[in-house]
Amino acid sequence: MEALRQRIEAAFEARANITPSSVEPGVRADVETVINMLDKGEMRVAEKIDGQWHVNQWLKKAVLLSFRIFDNGVIEGGETKYFDKVPMKFADYDEARFRAEAIRVVPPAAVRKGSFIGKNTVLMPSYVNLGAYVDEGTMVDTWATVGSCAQIGKNVHLSGGVGIGGVLEPLQAGPTIIEDNCFIGARSEIVEGVVVEEGSVISMGVYIGQSTRIYDRETGEIHYGRVPAGSVVVSGTLPSSCGKYNLYAAIIVKKVDEKTRGKVGINELLRIVD
């Protein structure tokens, strides 16, 4: 694996000179190997080790290299056709394979090859980009998008129209991460490598990037780039330094533990007590 990593790193440094027609066969084979392993969940762009997230940057580089290596081609899509560099994940699936992997895919959901979809996952008409990892028991609801290399935990609900940012456009240092047992409300956007920690509930229409202030109203603490575990978050504002206007912020209105979250419905958690 170390030898593969070194070859990917070297190819990435020379990426400006790589085209579909000029790429060396060995480099193409290495990138295909990585994409296939990501597709099967044998490797992932980010993984949690001893409570900390670690990004495997070389895997992300392989994903980026794939766009320089693979040429556009026609992709059959039932009633229509597409023309793109990345094939669709389920292009060769039959009923037996769908049943074996225990996933449900509602048309016209689009999932690119190189993304992993865990068992008992439901994909409504949604989009999952390559390099993404969607763990077991997760619901990706209608028109939700999971960006390139994003990491989605177990038993997560991404509501309708949710956007989980990727790392390709614009190029980001680390993937956006939604940990286990989180609920992301409709039309919310979590981007730029933000980590939403386990058991958090994000209300409808909350936008969080690295520069977004995440204000805990109980403690007065302001977080950036991280929603603490068990947070219930709504959109709001905080006063500017001059006091003349307010600026957007995400507000942590309460904290809940796993026991409370299991007993109380999501709608009840989102009711703000002044």
UniProtKB/Swiss-Prot annotation:
Keywords: Acyltransferase, Amino-acid biosynthesis, Cytoplasm, Diaminopimelate biosynthesis, Lysine biosynthesis, Repeat, Transferase. Its main location: cytoplasm. InterPro entries: DapD_Trfase_Hexpep_rpt_fam, Hexapep, Hexapep_transf_CS, THP_succinylTrfase_dom1, THP_succinylTrfase_N_sf, Trimer_LpxA-like_sf. Pfam families: Hexapep_2 (PF14602), THDPS_N_2 (PF14805). Homotrimer. Belongs to the transferase hexapeptide repeat family. This is 2,3,4,5-tetrahydropyridine-2,6-dicarboxylate N-succinyltransferase. It comes from Shewanella amazonensis (strain ATCC BAA-1098 / SB2B). The lineage of its organism: Bacteria, Pseudomonadati, Pseudomonadota, Gammaproteobacteria, Alteromonadales. The gene is dapD.
